[in-house]
Each structure stands twice: as C-alpha cells, then as structure tokens.
Amino acid sequence: VTRVPADLSSDDIAAVRSWVIHEDAHVIAFSKPPGLSSQGGRIKAHTLDDLLWAFARSNGKRPELVHRLDRDTSGVILAAKTKPAASFLGKALQMRRFRKQYLALLSAAPDPKAATIDAPLRREEIGRESYMRVVAFDTPGAQGSQSRYRTLAAGPEGAVVELEPLTGRMHQLRVHMAHIGRPLIGDVRYGGALTTPVGPAPRLMLHAAKLTFPHPEGGTTTVEAPPPEDFAKLKTALGL
C-alpha cells in the first residue's frame, strides 16, 4: 500500500521533532501529547502516524508505529525506522516481550492496594464506537486479559497508581480498573469521574510512563516520559 506523504507545516514538523525522547539507527520513541490520535480515526486532524512523514528519508521510507496509545493517553510510543526493526519489534510485541508501565489518577485508592486483575474482555460495537466489556471466561469471543496495579500514593481526594497490562487488549487498563470499581478520572466511556474535588478532569488521566522492549541489536532498552503538565498539575492539586 503506498501512502501519500501527509501535508505537514513547519510547525507540525517542529512539534513532532520536539516529542522525540529516544532515537538510534533502528527505533525512534516519542512522548505523545494527549489529544493526538496514534493512527486513523475519523477526525481530519493529523495523527502521529501522519506526522512520521517529518522523518521520511530521500527514498520515501519513513518510521512505522509499532503499537498504539488511545487518543487521550499521553506518553511513550515507539516507532521502527527500518523494515527489519518493524518486523522484529512486531514479533516481540506479539510474544509479550514489551513491558509497559502506566500512571493513572483515580478518585479513590483501590482495595487491596496492589493486585493482578484477571478478567476476560470482549469487544462490543455500540453505534460507531467500540467498547470492551468484562465477560465470563466461557463467553464466545472472550479474550483472556490480565493487568497488574499498585498504589503509589493515596489521600482523601484520590490516588495515583502504576498500571501494567500483561496482555494487549484494547482499553484493557481502563476497563479492568472500572471493573474493580476504580475507573480512571476523566474516563467518560467507562464511568470515570469528570470532576474532582479540585475541579474538572482535563482528560482521561492515563500516562504511558515507561516502556521496556527488546532492542533489534540485542539487550533491552527502557524509555521513560515524565507526565505532561495537565497530569502533574491535577496530581499535585489532589495532594498526591
């Protein structure tokens, strides 16, 4: 499939270059801002995938995203710079050799403070939207799904947790936390609070903080991105 280069402005190019947090001959990692789609979508605005044309070489080859983040999720996202790297990383992802660690804000601390959630999910289409729902193990179409969480800080106004998906289902962390009665702040789709004791939630409060992956040249590489200002501000305002 030949893709036409996206029509990027100099501001677009400067923006995507400013998000680079790691680059070598094989991979390039970005700290994705919230509100930017990874790929596709019905919104006419540029996606991160479009913006990768800023890194196109003279032969027309350009980096390819290895995985995705939801539009309102901020943080680390990885692209492969060569076809062999894309193939290697795609296989590693399928074999669950990526370790993804997220930070999330909740209205209250989970109980227990740390646990693994093992709850199968099934995709459901409602209108033009896709949702994931927790279902029984023997439900047709059920996909095994496990997530780990641990509470990093908690107070009367909320909690900050580290979340780690052990499988790679759509919306997995969001649905699993809602399933235990602790939906993420700002997660409209899965019942999260839109307001907090200190004001409105700016978005889904989920940030991909750290990604550890096998590098095409050997060994493992870890890339980290600090939470953006909206996340850090709300966390501080909640006394966390």
Residue ranges and their predicted role:
Residues 1-127, 131, 137-146, 154, ...:
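RNA pseudouridine synthases
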Residues 38, 44-52, 83, 119, ...:
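Pseudouridine synthase
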Residues 167, 213-220:
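Short acidic, glycine-rich loop/turn motifs
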